[in-house]
Amino acid sequence: MNLRKASSLLTFMGFLWGAWGQSIATPLPSATESKLRTPVVGDADSVYHKHETLVNVQFSQVQLSQWAAGGQSSASLIAKVDQFWEYDGMDFGWDTEFHGAFGLLHRPDDQVILKTDDRIELATKLGRRLKDKGSLTALGSFRTQLAPGYATVNGMPDVNQVTSRLMAPGYLVLALGLDMKPTESTTIFVAPFTSKSTFVLDDSLSAQGLFGVLPGERARHEVGGYIRVGLKEQVTENVTYAARLDLFSNYLEEPEAIDIFTDHVLTLKVNSWLSTTLGLTLIYDKDVELVLREPDPDIPGDPGDVGPGVQLKQILAVGLSLKFS
């Protein structure tokens, strides 16, 4: 490990341990602790339960006939389910959340169906409350997709070039750290002890050594530090902003190349069943190789550029929005 890598590792570890030590040494002001994290006074057997389910269905259609300006007819559908379970007792807290999304775009003119969204994610946190100092927490997080993804050639999916599928990749994070809630709308989880596993359970994809696994291997395991920051803010009566930031640094290999996952959702509620949603997701993982530049057909033997890069997804949709609790 060269000096630059060692310096980056020490800086990241120092930040983790500094956040850990500061949170243990400095109690959270009682005025800023959330009602959820405040121990129930009186009955030692008192507990707090909360369950919430959000269902969103968004649809759009473009129909063109003899349209002089040109264009293509299309129809798209995106369905999302978000579920949250919260349990709080005097000494323990347990939070679980599930996020599922799937979207398709149909172009009838060329009989093409494209996938526009695909996400399966489950995360759970079990914490032992430390008096006035947050919670000592174990976290487990899993993320994958449902349907195969294909390479796109000239705007068309090539079904002979599968680039991803269920559990290829799949990501599992297991972490032990301190969970803090400095304000009513903010959570911070700092874990100096974290295991991150990447699974590629498709033989054809693992043989290519995709997503950081060695060619022919089906899994890759990393040890490092992990930080998760969450925010859910009621901006106005009808506008909600939710954000999440995950950071992971591999202690043993290129610790300065931090994996980033961040998700932002702005929801504008029109009425009890209609809403507009603006979503932005950004991912950076040095182990995921992307086509940064297509080969130039005018240059013989040009391989193009392949390497790590920023993955970006943006969604603007209007549709049905239902909430159950």
Language model features by range: what are they?
Residues H51-V55, W94-F98, L136-G140, L172, ...:
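Transmembrane beta-strands of outer-membrane beta-barrel proteins
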Residues V57-Q63, G89-D91, G100-H106, F142-P148, ...:
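Transmembrane beta-strands of outer-membrane beta-barrel pores
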Residues M1-S46, S325:
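Cleavable N-terminal export/targeting peptides
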Residues E86-M90, G127-K133, T183-S185, K232-N238, ...:
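Outer-membrane beta-barrel channels and translocator barrels
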Residues L266, V310-S325:
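Outer-membrane beta-barrel "beta-signal"
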Residues S65-G71, H106-V112, P157-S164, G212-E217, ...:
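Extracellular loop and loop/strand-boundary signature of outer-membrane beta-barrel proteins
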